[in-house]
A protein has these predicted regions:
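Short, charged recognition helix plus adjacent turn
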Residues: 1-2, 69-77
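Recognition helix of helix-turn-helix/homeodomain-like DNA-binding domains
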Residues: 35-49
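Short basic helix-loop element that most often maps to the first helix and adjoining turn
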Residues: 14-33, 58
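A detector for short, charged/polar N-terminal pre-domain segments
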Residues: 1-11
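Conserved hydrophobic/aromatic packing and binding residues within compact polymer-binding modules
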Residues: 16, 30-31, 41-44, 70
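DNA major-groove recognition helix of helix-turn-helix/homeodomain DNA-binding modules
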Residues: 52-69
């Protein structure tokens, strides 16, 4: 089944939140490490905005995971 934009944003946001929490990071810490505003990260985690690949890259580096680890959630049923 093909996902729409909203579903993709929501799934990616949930995955980022799960990874952040598993690393014991606050939203403020991750936002700072990734070089973005706290409010932007919040909106990404909530699936409220589509973010750029660059921001996913920055977030993945800050979480010490690969970009595919974040996007693999899109292949889950």
């Amino acid at each position: 089944m093909e996902l729409n934009k909203k579903d993709v944003s929501k799934k990616v946001g949930i995955k980022i939140r799960e990874l952040r929490l598993s690393k014991g990071l606050s939203m403020e810490q991750l936002a700072f490490d990734a070089g973005m505003e706290y409010t932007q990260l919040s909106r990404i985690e909530l699936g409220k905005i589509n973010t750029s690949i660059y921001h996913v890259y920055k977030i993945s580096n800050s979480l010490s995971v690969t970009v595919p680890e974040i996007f693999n959630v899109l292949d889950e049923k």
